[in-house]
Amino acid sequence: MQLNKLMLGFMLCASALADDGQQAAEPHTSANFCKIDKDQQVGSTCDITFHELNEINEQIRPQLARLVKTDFFRYFKLDLYKECPFWSDNNGYCVNRACAVDVVDDWESVPDIWQPEVLGGLDEDSVKSEGGESDECSFLNELCGRRREFARPEPLSIDYCDVTDFTNKDSVLVDLVANPERFTGYGGEQSAQIWSAIYKENCFTLGEQGFCLAKDVFYRLISGLHASIATHLSNDYLDTKTGKWGPNLELFMARVGNHPDRVANIYFNFAVVAKALWKIQPYLERVEFCNVYDTNVKDMISNVVSRLDSRVFNEDLLFQDDISMRMKDDFRRRFKNVTKIMDCVHCDRCRMWGKVQTTGYATSLKILFEMDAGDEKARQRVVDKLTKYELIGLFNTFDRISKSVNAINNFERMYHSQMETNTSSIAAFFQNNFFRLGFTETEDQETSNATADMPLPEDSASDNEPYFADLKIPARRSKKQTKEESTSALQQELQGVYHALQFIWNSYVNLPRNLLILVLDVANTWFNNFIGVPTQINILGDDASD
């Protein structure tokens, strides 16, 4: 029963967020963009409305955007060339320049806290005798590589991502601000394989009823991540005609906006990450952020986290003490696999941001699932196991999901503006969603692109609905032709064949004459050079004689 209560809480919130109905032909109002009523309460476990979440995001957005650009939060470490652990496809790469990542090479431009001697330095005080843990995996009170002697807890298997990636000898330091997440053109069969593998991780082995609920929760987290990435790339899209980056409303509506459940899952993920940050707020106040950056960074973190509302999630209903350990272990293992699947992405920039965001969601799940509300020592133990890269990933992921929510509201304004200026054509476009016309369900799944380019899978609740139920396919022109039209078309084709054969025949007939002219011209040039007559003078003489 407790297991059911755990995941039922998630489902109540997620179900209230999602609207699985078909795309209606009725005009959208300002309170019903993408068929979501913003004044609707999210649910019994999420005592907050969409409108209130938008207000929270408006309050924290400017400060959060500045926070992730500070010296501490703008750098991340990962292995861009780690082999894919799931299939043997490690030689592929994206040839587009937009896929590349500019790694940190000029160390003089990097703050002291990110210098190699701080990142990779080891000494007796900074190495744990049992595990040999370096400063890069030090705890929150050692974020700047400071050496302190204190009793560390025994290692716990509570990680939802592979933290060893941060200490890999082949890992490189990247500046997230210098490598923004935007449309790269990466897609096709390989990217579809990536997302297919990610969604297939949502296959829990145990047959308990609670795992059906866990499957839905897992799906909404991944769907929210996928929809958020699609929103980012739609919001920062390269217009090949103007050469400028900007929002692409049509792409957003095709990938996200015409699917209310995807929009809802973005808000769902916003709530998950926001609650995780709110939950560790008391511990963040005791974190030291490196000398001159300490006060400024702490103030910005406080300004962001203090505005979060505890009503966004009621974890007392979601995370009980007697959660089935088998379910939680399976959930943890599968989400860790999701972070590892990112090593299979051929686009370096897509891989980088995929790693950052899956690390952020993994950190959120660790905080929400593993921090026991009734045990202060257990909570402190979980916080002590957080690495600085998990904290960096957590805040950058919150910035990404916050930017998605902000972009959704911006796309809403663009949507209504176009509806007012050209109601008939724009309305028909958004209702019909012609990007998917002419595709069968199988073709759509096989040829869809990843990140922004691959349409997200529909919610399982709508599997039994007609796939094109929301489309109004225009009547096709009859393919029957009259006898006169057929005769005319045949004559045109025969005439084209005749001219082609005539051209080939004339080429062969004129070949000897053309070869003779070529030989004489070369011989004339050679002879003039032999007798000492410059070619240039000879040409001038010919011109003069004319």
UniProtKB/Swiss-Prot annotation:
Enzyme class (EC, first level): oxidoreductase
Documented EC number(s): 1.8.4.-
GO cellular component, one term: endoplasmic reticulum membrane
Keyword Transferase set for record: no
Glycosylation (residues): N337, N422, N449
Membrane topology: Peripheral membrane protein
Binding locations of FAD: R182, T184, W195, S223, H226, R255
Disulfide-bonded cysteines: C84-C344, C94-C99, C137-C161, C144-C290, C347-C350
Subcellular location: Endoplasmic reticulum membrane
The entry's keywords: Disulfide bond, Electron transport, Endoplasmic reticulum, FAD, Flavoprotein, Glycoprotein, Membrane, Oxidoreductase, Redox-active center, Signal, Transport
Catalytic-site annotation from UniProt: C347 (nucleophile), C350
Cofactor(s) annotated in UniProt: FAD
GO biological process: one example: protein folding in endoplasmic reticulum
Assembly, per entry: May function both as a monomer and a homodimer.
Protein family according to the UniProt entry: Belongs to the EROs family.
Role this protein plays: Essential oxidoreductase that oxidizes proteins in the endoplasmic reticulum to produce disulfide bonds. Acts by oxidizing directly PDI1 isomerase through a direct disulfide exchange. Does not act as a direct oxidant of folding substrate, but relies on PDI1 to transfer oxidizing equivalent. Does not oxidize all pdi related proteins, suggesting that it can discriminate between PDI1 and related proteins. Its reoxidation probably involves electron transfer to molecular oxygen via FAD. Acts independently of glutathione.
The protein's name: Endoplasmic reticulum oxidoreductin-1
Originating organism: Eremothecium gossypii (strain ATCC 10895 / CBS 109.51 / FGSC 9923 / NRRL Y-1056)
